[in-house]
Every structure is written in structure tokens, then in C-alpha cells.
Swiss-Prot record:
Transit peptide interval: 1-14
GO cellular component: chloroplast thylakoid membrane; cytochrome b6f complex; mitochondrion
Protein name: Cytochrome b6-f complex subunit 4, chloroplastic
UniProt-annotated location(s): Plastid, Chloroplast thylakoid membrane
Superkingdom field: Eukaryota
Keywords: Chloroplast, Electron transport, Membrane, Photosynthesis, Plastid, Thylakoid, Transit peptide, Transmembrane, Transmembrane helix, Transport
Length: 173
């Protein structure tokens, strides 16, 4: 390790570990406006880790327990092992893929269309050659693919709950 590397690492560490200068008038003006917490170098330990995180965790836990007590999950009718239901639906997050397989008549084409989704998503970064840390709204291809995919997934998900003849049109036409 050279002397320059040691000096630059010590400068970085001094800037990171530097205590705030409370006699600085600019800092005092910001503190007076209420911009003090963690803005001027207040350490995360013990303030945030011992006080704020447990409050947030317990608040989230209390909200979940409260919602579970006030609105319990209803249980459906008991399953009859001797009768198959007319329409078997998957869990809600499988509705778009279920509907895609259901409406495409050729099963191989249905499976290939499902495989085309991740393959298409993999190609998006190569199509759009911009800085990956740029604002997402300045990445038109990725934003368009995301919005179109969301609309199609919602459309197919709603269609999965309808009969097969209305699965694509949703009964609009």
C-alpha cells in the first residue's frame, strides 16, 4: 500500500467519521428549521437501530395482527373427494399464465409463448443502450415494456376468472 493510498483512505475515513461543527451558522440555520436528524452526521447506532427500527417492526406487526383479528380469512366449503369441480382455478398469481395456456389452442405454442416472456425481458437491456443508473422515465423501451406487460398481465388475470369464450374479450365484444 503506497503512502498516497493510505493518505486518501485516511482522508475518506476522517470525512466519514467527522463530527459536526455545531458552531457553523449554516448548520445551525438548518437545525433550527428542523433538518437535524441524521442530516448532520448523527450516527445510526444506537439512535435508529435501538429506537426507530423496533418501533417500525412492532407497528407493522401490530397492524398485521389487528387486521387478521378484525377480518379473518374465511374458510370455504369442505372439499368433496368424490366430485371434481367444474372449473379448477389456480392461485391468483397464476391467473395470467393459466389464461394464456387456456386460450391458445396449441399447447406447444402456449408453452413457447410463456417461455418468450422471460426471453423478451432479457433482451430489453441490449435493445436500450443507455446508462443503467439513469432515471427510469428516460428509458422509454424498458418503461414501455413494463407498462405493456402490466396491462397484459392484468387483462389475462381478469380473463382467467371468466368462461373460456369471454377470456380474451372480457365480455366487452
Amino acid at each position: 500500500e503506497s503512502a498516497l493510498e493510505r493518505r486518501s483512505s485516511s482522508v475518506v475515513m476522517n470525512n466519514v467519521m467527522k463530527k459536526p461543527d455545531l458552531s457553523d451558522p449554516k448548520l445551525r440555520a438548518k437545525l433550527a428549521k428542523g433538518m437535524g436528524r441524521n442530516y448532520y452526521g448523527e450516527p445510526a447506532w444506537p439512535n435508529d437501530l435501538l429506537y426507530m427500527f423496533p418501533v417500525c417492526i412492532l407497528g407493522t406487526f401490530a397492524a398485521i395482527v389487528g387486521l387478521a383479528v378484525m377480518q379473518p380469512t374465511p374458510t370455504g366449503e369442505p372439499a368433496n373427494p368424490f366430485a371434481t369441480p367444474l372449473e379448477i382455478l389456480p392461485e391468483w398469481y397464476f391467473f395470467p399464465t393459466f389464461n394464456l395456456l387456456r386460450v391458445i389452442p396449441n399447447k406447444l405454442l402456449g408453452v413457447l409463448s410463456m417461455a418468450a416472456v422471460p426471453a423478451g425481458l432479457i433482451t430489453v437491456p441490449f435493445i436500450e443502450n443507455v446508462n443503467k443508473f439513469q432515471n427510469p422515465f428516460r428509458r422509454p423501451v424498458a418503461t414501455s415494456v413494463f407498462l405493456l406487460g402490466t396491462v397484459v398481465a392484468i387483462w389475462l388475470g381478469i380473463g382467467a376468472t371468466l368462461p373460456i369464450d369471454k377470456a380474451i374479450s372480457l365480455g366487452f365484444w
